[in-house]
Amino acid sequence: TIPYSRLSNDCELISVRIAKTEDKLESTIKSLGSLKEDEYRAREQLTEIRTILTDAKAKIKSYKIPVLPKNYFVELSEAKEGINEIIAELDKKPIVISDLNTRVDTGRDLVLKLYTLSSELTKTAGLAEMAIVYANRYRSSYKEMDMTLEKAEKEFLSGDYKKSLETTLNALNRIEPGIHKKLISAFES
């Protein structure tokens, strides 16, 4: 027979062990819940990032830019790679949340950079085209304007929209000082 005091002591030890195990289990369950929330949040952000990428590409397609600069394709490739890295990180088991968060941040930054470039390209190309069209009214009256517009059109068709815009506005400002403000205002409205 086992003495009662020993049984009581053993029961107390077992009770303490069970309490510690319950605490560890509760902590683990909370941690798993947090990991699931982080994974879910990352998947939501991936969806948002993909939407931004789609919007950036649609912006370029909608304007029908004649020539896209090489850096656009580099940034597009980097953005797609950033998304692929997020997907690869989400497919890993177990997921390392710190790595996943880094991939999501990097992917978002790359896609936003592409979106910004797309916006700038379409705005600059649109403004350059508008300036050339506006300047055409002076083409027959001013020989220098005709030559300048030929140069600006070549720059435009080669994809150097910023240079084309600068060339056209410089020529227009000689004939109509301050016209660039009116053109920008008209373009933005």
Language-model features, listed with the residues they occupy:
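Long, charged/polar, soluble alpha-helical segments
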Residues: 1-189
